[in-house]
């Protein structure tokens, strides 16, 4: 619900001067992600570049800097600007390899494959696909990103069988995740309804008791 997210992000921005450094980073990242999921990649890029500028004043936030750079690379690739993504991506991979971050690296390798494809270096793209299969425990969103890349890559290679297989796997996982989100949303609405119903019942109960008490006072007064 991007209308709602904009309302709350705008409200959060009013508290900017009261935010701690990490809260400011989280705000900027959430704002950029909001644009990203709307596919508003230009505003998304501007927001992540703003985040990068903000982080330069906080060199102690090294992890956050490379997360930000990973986001910037992602947007450059969405905008088909491989030349801008190139140097940032390899610095990111080197950092997260050093940190042995198995949660982030699979996604960065997918970015590396995408970069090779956009540069028309299909030999390197194929080598990367073979070298970096997704490990067990990969985040579902990162699996989706890899499946999306693979179905586009094999479509470009005219390997229709593999393209169809990866497209089918992508659609099945995406539908499953969407169903999970719908269930979570439904559960959230149910909880809100039950909470509001409980509050309403409490108000009705209190109102009833107040009426009974008023009647008692009236009889006593008579």
Predicted feature locations:
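Amphipathic alpha-helical segments of tetratricopeptide repeats
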Residues: 10-16, 49-57, 90-97, 130-135, ...
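Residue register of alpha-helical TPR repeats
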Residues: 26, 66-67, 107, 145
């Amino acid at each position: 619900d991007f209308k709602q997210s904009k309302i709350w992000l705008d409200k959060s921005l009013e508290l900017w001067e009261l935010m701690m450094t990490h809260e400011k980073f989280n705000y900027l990242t959430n704002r950029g992600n909001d644009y990203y999921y709307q596919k508003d990649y230009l505003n998304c890029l501007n927001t992540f570049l703003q985040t990068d500028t903000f982080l330069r004043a906080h060199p102690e936030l090294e992890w956050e800097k490379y997360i930000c750079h990973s986001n910037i690379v992602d947007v450059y690739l969405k905008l088909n600007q491989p030349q801008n993504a190139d140097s940032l991506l390899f610095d990111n991979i080197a950092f997260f390899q050093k940190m042995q971050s198995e949660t982030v690296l699979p996604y960065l390798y997918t970015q590396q494959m995408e970069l090779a494809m956009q540069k028309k270096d299909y030999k390197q793209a194929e080598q990367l696909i073979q070298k970096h299969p997704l490990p067990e425990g990969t985040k579902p969103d990162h699996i989706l990103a890899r499946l999306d890349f693979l179905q586009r890559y094999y479509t470009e290679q005219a390997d229709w069988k593999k393209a169809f297989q990866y497209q089918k796997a992508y659609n099945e996982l995406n539908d499953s995740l969407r169903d999970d989100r719908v269930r979570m949303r439904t559960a959230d609405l149910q909880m809100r309804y039950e909470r509001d119903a409980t509050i309403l019942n409490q108000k009705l109960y209190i109102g009833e008791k107040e009426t009974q008490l008023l009647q008692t006072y009236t009889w006593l007064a008579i």
